[in-house]
A protein has these predicted regions:
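Intrinsic disorder/low-structure terminal segments
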Residues: 59, 73-76, 137, 146, ...
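Non-catalytic nucleic-acid substrate-recognition regions in nucleic-acid-modifying enzymes
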Residues: 12, 18-20, 24-112
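Alpha-helical context
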Residues: 2, 6, 10, 58-65, ...
C-alpha cells in the first residue's frame, strides 16, 4: 500500500481497492489520505493558526524517542520541538482526522530537519552530527583516519518552521482536491497492516480486476 496515493486516486475515480503493508507508517498515511474529502478545512486552518502562535518553553526538556540507529539524528532544539509538538498533538482538542493529518506532517518533516538522509535501506549521516563527531574522536584516539566528510544538505531546517510549512502546503492541497473532486464517486478502500503473503490467500476467488504494485528492489527482502 505504501503511502496510499494509488488507493486515494482509485477512490477519487470510483474504484474500490484492497491493499496491504507491513509498515506502521502506511496506516498513518493511508488514513490521512483516505479522509481527504472528509476534512473540515476551517478546523485545519484553525489548528494551523494555533500552532503558529504556539512556542516551546525554554524549560521544555523532553526529547523525541530514538533507537540506536537514530541517536543524535537532530539538532538539540529540533529534538525537543518534535516531542513538544507530538505531546501537543495528542492532547489537543481537534478531531482525530486532524490529529492524524498533523502526525503525517510531522513524519514528513523529520528528514529535512535532521542530520540524516535516506540512502537505500541505510541512513547517510552528516559530518556535523554529534554521532559522527564522536565517532571521529574515537577514531583519532586510535590513530585512525576520520570518516569521509559528508553534507546531507546545506542547512538543517528548523523543525517548527518545517512542520508549519508542511501543514500549510497540505491544507492548500486539500482545498484544491475537495474543490475539484466534488463530483467524483466515492469508493471503498480496504486496508490491512500485514504482509500480502498472509492476506492474499484469504481473499475470495475472482474479486480482483487488476493489480498495481511497485517494481521489485534488489536489496529488499520482502519482494
Amino acid at each position: 500500500m505504501g503511502s496510499g496515493t494509488t488507493a486515494l486516486v482509485c477512490q477519487m475515480q470510483g474504484i474500490n481497492s484492497i491493499g496491504y503493508d507491513v509498515m506502521p507508517i502506511a496506516d498513518v498515511s493511508l488514513k490521512a489520505k483516505a479522509a481527504c474529502m472528509e476534512y473540515d478545512l476551517p478546523e485545519l486552518r484553525a489548528m494551523l493558526e494555533e500552532l503558529k502562535s504556539l512556542h516551546m518553553p525554554d524549560s521544555y526538556s523532553l526529547k523525541t524517542p530514538c533507537i540506536p540507529i537514530t541517536q543524535d539524528a537532530y539538532p538539540e532544539y529540533n529534538e525537543r520541538y518534535l516531542q513538544f509538538i507530538e505531546d501537543w498533538r495528542i492532547h489537543c482538542i481537534y478531531s482525530e482526522n486532524a490529529k492524524n493529518l498533523l502526525r503525517l506532517c510531522i513524519l514528513n518533516s523529520l528528514e529535512p530537519c535532521s542530520y540524516t538522509v535516506k540512502s537505500g535501506q541505510y541512513l547517510g549521516w552528516d559530518s556535523r552530527s554529534p554521532k559522527v563527531i564522536h565517532a571521529n574522536e574515537l577514531r583519532a584516539a586510535k590513530g585512525k583516519k576520520p570518516l569521509s566528510a559528508k553534507t546531507v544538505r546545506s542547512n538543517i531546517l528548523d523543525s517548527r518552521d518545517t512542520v508549519l510549512l508542511e501543514l500549510s502546503h497540505v491544507i492548500h492541497d486539500l482545498e484544491v482536491i475537495q474543490h475539484s473532486s466534488q463530483t467524483h464517486e466515492k469508493a471503498q478502500i480496504t486496508y490491512k497492516q500485514n504482509s500480502v503473503l498472509f492476506e492474499l490467500p484469504r481473499l475470495p476467488d475472482n474479486i480482483l480486476k487488476g493489480v498495481i504494485t511497485s517494481p521489485p528492489y534488489c536489496n529488499r527482502y520482502d519482494y
